[in-house]
A protein has these predicted regions:
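Membrane-integrated ABC transporters
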Residues: 1-58, 67-87, 101-105, 130-171, ...
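A hydrophobic transmembrane-helix motif
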Residues: 49, 53, 62, 93, ...
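Cytosolic ends of transmembrane helices, especially the final helix of ABC transmembrane type-1 domains
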Residues: 220-223, 234, 249-255, 261, ...
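Helix-to-loop junction immediately C-terminal to a conserved catalytic motif
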Residues: 426
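Conserved "ABC signature" C-loop
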Residues: 450-496
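ABC-family ATPase nucleotide-binding domain "signature/switch" substructure
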Residues: 460, 493-588, 594, 603
Length: 603
């Protein structure tokens, strides 16, 4: 997001970029090919059937209108009560069909949204896409696309799609009536006579076509403006969420003035785009209002044209009213195309944002560094050069081999690439060159700031596994061992533990996770930075005591941790890092034999 006078632009607003996106059918078709989708398709057929039944009721009402006014014109007042009763019964049946169709449509909408949300969420979480998207800033506001755009896309697709399916039936049905009732139109030009059959039908189509073309010309920018509005609203919401998440830090810095400025700058984009959208919508609404005013006078035209037939006795009063009703039904049905134009522009914007999400989540992730599995539990690197996304070199890591059961301390000045090395070992950093060998399973990564999910404290301790995977007694014992005895009775208390626990307490929870998972290889990235030196020693001692055969790779700054490692990897600045054996602490570690958890875990 930028803060200058120009709007930030993303690929969903760029026509050239949109050509590389998957076709919209990738969003529309997959659900209907599933077993759940087949049942929803049956429900959708019932909805379409109810729509066509409503059209039949409208046709019946059209015929009823003719009979009603014919009875009045012929002074046959005795038949009026019977006609009114029949009208009431048909109206009640039509209302029941219409309401049933609406309920079924809502059910289909809920089912489709649930499936599409699950499908897109799986794509977001697959292959670490969620991390790659944020790391490389490939997409903004993914949460808004899945939560909000999916809801709007499903709703608008059903509304527009069902409208497109019902309009032809209504138009054809009433066009037949209008063609029959209208008769031929004779014109005399230069002594020649011309006859035009179904002239009222052609007039209705020409009238609606002109309105649609004019509406598109006036509102064509709405697609881009709507997509931009979704993004700008999402950017503004992200800033407010950040204030909530880091409320304490902002309060310590007294940064409310700065945050207010950032929020105002972001919201200025929102307001500017709203005004631009308002201007376009006003033009469209003004035109539509004029059309609506003219439409109220349109029935006079077929009445005047058919007046000679009425005066000559070739057309009854009921026939005249029936023709006017049919003309209104045809123009009203065709009006769907220009009345639904704003909805169509919103649908296009929603579809483009979801297509962009598919484009980003489905392309093969970049992986310049070769990753291989270690059969012996060793961790090794050869020819490893770490780069940033632009290709600039961050650090050159010397070749090293860490045998199973050994413990290595990675040291160096801040910013020299230590944490990036651990990301590369985890397979989360693709930029660079060289080869990495690591165990395929039984590994556990502890970043400096661990993720604490909302829910119970036990769920936070057992993450990423389910809370039911471990007994309460084991979790309580680990809380006591890791210096969290005060929280042991609160194991099943639901809370936002990420805000309730201090930074040091969160790092203690992370150590409890490691001891609970019993991995064979542990990677620690300054995961005790919020603890005092004594607490740090106690947790490292507990780790070695409980996992004596585990391979450990630690990134840390404190020299006191040398006593808990037998190998170091130094990153001097600005020279290249060099690996060496610490002769004073040289010990031969045992091969890894601890119980391995499933897969590589980042917590």
């Amino acid at each position: 997001m930028t803060v200058n006078g120009a709007f930030p632009v993303d690929r969903a607003e760029d026509a050239q970029a949109r050509r590389r996106f998957p076709p919209v059918w990738r969003l529309l078709l997959p659900y209907w090919r599933t077993r759940e989708g087949v049942f929803s398709l049956i429900l959708l057929m019932l909805v379409i059937g109810s729509s066509w039944a409503t059209t039949y009721v409208m046709l019946w009402n059209n015929n009823w209108t003719g009979m009603f006014y014919d009875a009045i014109g012929a002074s046959r007042f005795k038949v009026l009560p019977e006609l009114l009763v029949r009208f009431l019964l048909v109206a009640m049946a039509g209302a029941a069909v219409h309401i049933t169709g609406g309920v079924l449509q809502e059910i289909v909408q809920i089912r489709w949204r649930r499936w599409l949300t699950t499908w897109l969420t799986e794509k977001w979480l697959a292959r670490n896409n969620y991390y790659r998207i944020e790391r490389d800033r490939e997409l903004e506001n993914v949460d808004q696309r899945i939560a909000e755009d999916v809801k709007l896309f499903v709703n608008d697709t059903l509304l527009l799609g069902l409208g497109l399916l019902s309009v032809p039936v209504s138009v054809v049905s009433f066009s037949v009536v209008l063609w029959r009732m209208g008769g031929p139109f004779q014109m005399h030009v230069g002594g020649s006579s011309y006859v035009l059959h179904g002239y009222l039908v052609f007039a209705a189509f020409a009238y609606t076509s002109v309105i649609f073309v004019a509406t598109h010309y006036l509102g064509r920018r709405l697609i881009t403006l709507t997509a931009r509005q979704h993004r700008l609203e999402g950017d503004f919401r992200v800033l407010m969420v950040g204030v909530r998440e880091f409320a304490e830090q902002i309060a310590f810095f007294q940064g409310q003035t700065s945050e207010h400025g950032r929020l105002q700058a972001s919201f200025r984009f929102v307001v500017s785009n709203l005004y631009a959208t308002l201007w376009v919508r006003t033009r469209v609404s003004f035109f539509n209002n004029i059309v609506g005013q003219l439409s109220s006078a349109i029935p006079i035209i077929p009445t005047l044209l058919m007046l000679p037939q009425l005066m000559s006795g070739g057309l009854t009063l009921g026939g005249l009213m029936k023709s006017n009703s049919a003309f209104n039904s045809v123009t009203g049905s065709l009006a769907f195309f220009w009345q639904a134009y704003p909805g169509f522009t919103s649908w296009r914007a929603e579809a483009n944002r979801l297509r962009e999400f598919l484009h980003v989540s489905e392309h093969d992730p970049r992986q310049d560094i070769a990753l291989h599995e270690s059969r012996t539990g060793a961790v090794a690197a050869s020819g490893l050069v770490l780069r940033d996304a632009s290709g600039d070199t961050l650090s050159r890591v010397p070749d090293f081999v860490l045998l199973a059961g050994r413990r290595c301390l990675v040291r160096g000045r801040s910013g020299c690439g230590k944490s990036t090395l651990l990301r590369a070992l985890a397979g989360l950093w693709p930029y660079g060159e060289g080869t990495i060998v690591r165990p395929a399973a039984g590994t556990f990564f502890l970043p400096q700031r661990s993720y604490i999910p909302p829910g119970s404290l036990k769920a936070a301790v057992t993450y990423p596994r389910d809370a039911s995977a471990y007994p309460d007694s084991e979790c309580e014992a680990l809380l006591h061992a890791c210096g969290l005895s005060a929280y042991a009775p609160l194991l099943h208390v639901e809370d936002r533990w990420s805000t309730r626990l201090s930074g040091g307490e969160q790092q203690r929870v992370a150590f409890a996770r490691v001891l609970l998972a019993q991995p064979s290889t542990v990677f620690l990235d300054e995961c005790t930075s919020a603890l005092d030196s004594q607490s740090e020693k106690e947790l490292y001692g507990l780790l070695i005591e409980r996992l004596p055969q585990a391979t450990v790779v630690s990134v840390a700054h404190r020299k006191e941790l040398l006593a808990f490692h037998d190998t170091t990897l130094d990153f001097p600045a600005p020279a290249a890092p060099e690996a060496r054996q610490d002769a004073a602490d040289e010990t031969e570690g045992a091969h890894a034999g601890g119980r391995a958890s499933v897969g590589t875990q980042l917590c």
